[in-house]
Design a protein with these regions (language model features):
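Acyl-CoA/ACP chain-elongation machinery
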Residues: 28-50, 55-59, 66, 96
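Condensing-enzyme catalytic core mediating Claisen C-C bond formation in acyl metabolism
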Residues: 58-96
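Glycine/charged-rich beta-loop-alpha catalytic/anionic-binding loops adjacent to active sites
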Residues: 1-6, 55-63
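Active-site-proximal alpha-helical scaffold in enzymes
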Residues: 3-36, 71-87
Length: 96
C-alpha cells in the first residue's frame, strides 16, 4: 500500500488519520498504520522564542498567572482497520 510522510505542522496527525480513513472507506486499503512524531530542535525553540512565547520563568500550565508554553516531545501510532462484523469477536484492543 501507500507509504507517505506528511509535514503540516500541528495538523500532521489529523491529516494522516483523515487520509487513512479515506483510503479504507474507499476500499483502497484494508488497514493503515498511522502515527506522528514531534521532536524538539534548535530551530523550533528559536522560533517560539522569537514569537515571545517562551517564558523566562518556569511554566505553570494550570496557574491563573501562567505565561509561556510547555514544549515537549512525543510519538503515537495507531492501526486503523476496516470494520468487519465477522472479525469483531476476535478483536482485542491493546495499548500502552
Amino acid at each position: 500500500g501507500p507509504a507517505l510522510t506528511v509535514s503540516t505542522a500541528c495538523s500532521s496527525s489529523a491529516k494522516v488519520f483523515a487520509s487513512a480513513e479515506r483510503l479504507i472507506r474507499l476500499g483502497l486499503a484494508d488497514a493503515a498504520l498511522v502515527g506522528g512524531v514531534d521532536t524538539l530542535c534548535g530551530s523550533v525553540l528559536f522560533g517560539f522564542n522569537a514569537l515571545q512565547l517562551v517564558s523566562a520563568e518556569p511554566c505553570r500550565p494550570f496557574d491563573a498567572e501562567r505565561s509561556g508554553i510547555s514544549l515537549g516531545e512525543a510519538a503515537g501510532f495507531a492501526l486503523l482497520e476496516r470494520d468487519d462484523p465477522a472479525d469483531r469477536a476476535s478483536i482485542r484492543l491493546v495499548g500502552w
